[in-house]
A protein has these predicted regions:
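Generic preference for hydrophobic/aromatic residues in regular secondary structure cores
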Residues: 29, 45, 79-80
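Residues that form generic nucleotide/phosphate-binding pockets
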Residues: 19, 23, 44, 48, ...
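Extended alpha-helical interaction segments
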Residues: 1-41
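Basic, alpha-helical nucleic-acid-binding regions used in initiation and control of genome expression
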Residues: 5-9, 23, 57, 69-123
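Residue-level signal for the start and early helices of compact helical domains
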Residues: 11, 15, 36, 64, ...
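Conserved, aromatic- and glycine-enriched, well-ordered alpha/beta core segments
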Residues: 34, 41, 58-64, 71-72, ...
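Compact, well-ordered interaction domains used in eukaryotic information-processing assemblies
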Residues: 45-57, 61-66
Length: 123
């Protein structure tokens, strides 16, 4: 995997997610409560859009680290394909553990935010 392709994909994620949302709206919904865990999306996206696998993974990285995606991993047993249909792949315990850890990190950052803003206001 090309690290530079992955980094470029991650940095361009915001605009590329909009492209993915236009092409596969059920896989990349705008509303957080509609998000579902994806089934091996990177290779299919790379093939469909002519991207490298590393670039596609980079684009998807911020998406799967979002709070809404982590919550979806914990709430849904089945993963979905890009067209929104249910995949045969299930959400495994490792994915649930990673989502739980990520949500804890997000919560800790949110808890620190008022303190950080107060400190910035004093400067």
């Amino acid at each position: 995997m090309s690290k530079s392709d992955w980094k470029r994909g991650a940095s361009e994620s915001r605009q590329q997610i909009e492209l993915l949302r236009a092409r596969w709206p059920k896989a990349f919904p705008a509303k957080g409560h509609e998000v579902r865990p994806l089934a091996n999306a990177a290779p299919a996206i790379a093939e469909a859009l002519g991207w490298s696998n590393a670039y596609a993974r980079g684009v998807l990285s911020p998406w799967v680290l979002r709070e809404a995606y982590c919550r979806a991993v914990l709430a849904h047993a089945m993963r979905i394909n890009l067209d929104g249909s249910e995949s045969e792949l299930t959400v495994d315990d490792e994915a649930r553990a990673m989502a739980t850890a990520r949500l804890a990190l997000i919560a800790a950052r949110k808890a620190q935010e008022p303190e950080r803003k107060a400190q910035e206001g004093q400067n």
